[in-house]
Amino acid sequence: MEAKLLVLFCTFAALKADTICIGYHANNSTDTVDTVLEKNVTVTHSVNLLENSHNGKLCSLNGIAPLQLGKCNVAGWLLGNLECDLLLTANSWSYIIETSNSENGTCYPGEFIDYEELREQLSSVSSFEKFEIFPKASSWPNHETTKGVTAACSYLGASSFYRNLLWMTKKGTSYPKLSKSYTNNKGKEVLVLWGVHHPPTTSEQQTLYQNVDAYVSVGSSKYNRRFTPEIAARPKVRGQAGKMNYYWTLLDQGDTITFEATGNLIAPWYAFALNKGSDSGIITSDAPVHNCDTKCQTPYGALNSSLPFQNVHPITIGECPKYVKSTKLRMATGLRNVPSIQSRGLFGAIAGFIEGGWTGMIDGWYGYHHQNEQGSGYAADQKSTQSAIDGITNKVNSVIEKMNTQFTAVGKEFNNLERRIENLNKKVDDGFLDVWTYNAELLVLLENERTLDFHDSNVRNLYEKVKSQLRNNAKEIGNGCFEFYHKCDDECMESVKNGTYDYPKYSEESKLNREEIDGVKLESMGVYQILAIYSTVASSLVLLVSLGAVSFWMCSNGSLQCRICI
């Protein structure tokens, strides 16, 4: 009985032993990240690298409003289509907006030669100065400048023509050869537009220009071309059997352009001195223009984000994240978030870091939980936590800085005859996009794996730090915790945490308690062995007595015959 009481007392004393545990932070975060080896790992903290939202608005870009062309397209705006009069004073923009119904372009049917290239050139233009390159009143005294009108370009119910071009016809009965030059003295490139008319019949050719064998010649240091009218019957378009082809060139500073013609010239009236240097672009969007400002615009809406990637739209203008096909790019900064199930016994034992993290520790990533006669509590290890925060912050910033190359990505322009080139270009762009997406996803997977391993290593290092201090003054109890062989008050606990634990000071007490506990274990084992032998012998005797009694009863009533032979 004394042995049993001694064992119970020792068990009770063991439960009261002072303990210290090493563990890590946990919280109620539901953030998940992917690693090379795992999917949807819940972590305490993470940062998102992928922007997937927009405001649904077309905004000013860095304080400069866009140019909304409305129902007009670039051709109608530059030629001066009468339906585009609201754009006559437009001279600066951050980007240009066409809509899905921007159909007012060339009112007189024909081709706009190298139109796609012109649109591409406008991607680097943010403003221009519109000026009369050849004043209407004084430039063409020998030719008619008021009768060149058409019902195809009507205005207020009357025939008219483009605002920026002059359709010159014969004056009286003659169309004398004309020659007119302009020298660029604007200090910047000048955009010059003109046209050539192709009548359907020789009769119309003579009616308009008198000369049947007319020509148009345009020349500069970089452009030189001679045109002859293509007189042929054509199906009517917009009520016209004739056609006009439209041309353009960029005239360098100091260069001279000369127009020479004996008929069929659609002469430039206004030209545009271009201000280049900024990233502009042309987007097609039906989103509304609002009084807002952004640094990045997509056709769907503005992005106000400093993230390195976005999956909103591949077409962007301004300082924009790189477009990728990914749906999730989240980088882990914290630890695996596995809150421990805090099963509490008589003295409220706390599960250690092997079983899960601590939601009670809120001021650090790694730390301690202690329990002694003075109470219990959590304390973060600030040094290891701060070192980890600094390292991970630097890593995240470095990744964002390296990948956050912000730029404009506008669509490339191709005409109907360049479909094979366009298709090839799309395949190349898709290939680059796949590579960018793969690189971004792989980078995040690898860094997440490294971050979680880094945290695991830090917890293990903290555990080993405590273990190396305590040595045999405490024992490991298998859940990230140590049980002291001596009394460890709050001052003692603090010394373990800050690395100043005095091992010799507690070694003698620990040695005595270790020996006492080991002795109790041995004595308890001897008692249990004696009890086991006694129990076995007693059970055997009871069995023999019972068997004898049954046999005697059976013999007495004749159920069993007993013979004793001598």
Swiss-Prot record:
Alphabetical keyword list: Clathrin- and caveolin-independent endocytosis of virus by host, Clathrin-mediated endocytosis of virus by host, Disulfide bond, Fusion of virus membrane with host endosomal membrane, Fusion of virus membrane with host membrane, Glycoprotein, Hemagglutinin, Host cell membrane, Host membrane, Host-virus interaction, Lipoprotein, Membrane, Palmitate, Signal, Transmembrane, Transmembrane helix, Viral attachment to host cell, Viral envelope protein, Viral penetration into host cytoplasm, Virion, Virus endocytosis by host, Virus entry into host cell
GO-annotated biological processes: clathrin-dependent endocytosis of virus by host cell; fusion of virus membrane with host endosome membrane; fusion of virus membrane with host plasma membrane; viral budding from plasma membrane; virion attachment to host cell
Disulfide topology: 21-481, 59-292, 72-84, 107-153, 296-320, 488-492
Post-translational modification: Palmitoylated. In natural infection, inactive HA is matured into HA1 and HA2 outside the cell by one or more trypsin-like, arginine-specific endoprotease secreted by the bronchial epithelial cells. One identified protease that may be involved in this process is secreted in lungs by club cells.
Membrane-related topology note: Single-pass type I membrane protein
Residues with a covalently attached lipid (S-palmitoyl cysteine): 555, 562, 565
An example Gene Ontology molecular-function term: host cell surface receptor binding
InterPro entries (alphabetical): Capsid_hemagglutn, Hemagglutn_HA1_a/b_dom_sf, Hemagglutn_influenz_A, Hemagglutn_influenz_A/B
tRNA processing among keywords: no
Compartments, record wording: Virion membrane; Host apical cell membrane
Site (Cleavage): 344-345
Leftover remarks: Major glycoprotein, comprises over 80% of the envelope proteins present in virus particle.
Protein name according to UniProt: Hemagglutinin
Species assigned in the record: Influenza A virus (strain A/Duck/Australia/749/1980 H1N1)
Biological classification of the source: Viruses, Riboviria, Orthornavirae, Negarnaviricota, Polyploviricotina
Protein encoded by which gene: HA
